[in-house]
Regions:
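C-terminal accessory regions
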Residues: 121-214
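Conserved helicase motor core of P-loop NTPases
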Residues: 1-132
Length: 214
């Protein structure tokens, strides 16, 4: 589980139902299906969420991979390699580039890589279109399950990214989005289930959709 869970709500307007849902979660009260203002608790997921929602949050890494594969197919990214306009997430801080673990970006260009085992992307902050794009070098293993991740010597001086359509609640800490879909896997976290769910709900500024598992 994450080392730190936020316990103060500060992103939402005071009358936003997100606060009500987050408070229920923090107090370990089970959430009920229904509509809460612009927010929703449901028992099924609609793939249109990858068009309509800013960020999907899950609990398990395996679920994250499945969701990202579904998102890419739904959005018609048919290549096994990352393409222009795809959303990616930083997996490791890089002080030289000024990027941090959990930051999300969009691929805006495909460049010639230094070796066939790497991708070279031009990327831009996911929600700041005015920011200048910069280049990154990423080993293919971070996007391709058929390629093993090499040792640190091979990765030295390069960056680490993965697809960002769905990310774990752990990776979401410190970030915020206008709309969030939470695929509720809080059961994975045992006694900390309510803290995980609270953290995910409070990543949303304006609207949250929670998909309750059966």
């Amino acid at each position: 589980t994450p080392d730190v869970m936020l316990t103060e709500i500060h992103r939402q307007a005071k009358d936003n139902p997100i606060i009500h849902l987050a408070t229920l979660a923090r107090n370990k009260q089970r959430l009920k299906l229904g509509t809460y203002g612009d927010s929703l608790i449901t028992d099924s997921i609609n793939l249109n969420c990858f068009n309509d929602i800013n960020q999907v949050l899950v609990g398990k890494n395996d679920t994250r991979k499945i969701m990202n594969n579904r998102a890419r197919k739904f959005l018609k990214f048919d290549s096994e390699d990352p393409l222009i306009d795809e959303r990616i997430i930083c997996l490791q801080n890089d002080a030289t580039l000024g990027i941090y673990n959990g930051g999300t970006f969009k691929i805006v260009d495909r460049l010639k890589a230094k070796s066939p085992n790497f991708y070279k992307f031009g990327i831009q902050d996911d929600y700041s279109q005015n920011e200048q794009a910069f280049s990154t070098s990423v080993h293919k293993s971070f996007f391709r399950a058929d390629i093993p991740i090499p040792n640190w010597k091979v990765l030295k001086g390069t960056q680490q990214f993965d697809y960002a359509y769905a990310i774990t609640g752990h990776k979401s800490q410190g970030s915020q989005w206008k709309s969030v879909l939470v695929y509720d896997e809080s059961y994975v976290f045992g006694d900390n289930w309510s803290r995980w769910l609270y953290t995910c709900i409070t990543r949303a500024e304006e609207r949250v959709e929670i998909v309750m598992k059966e």
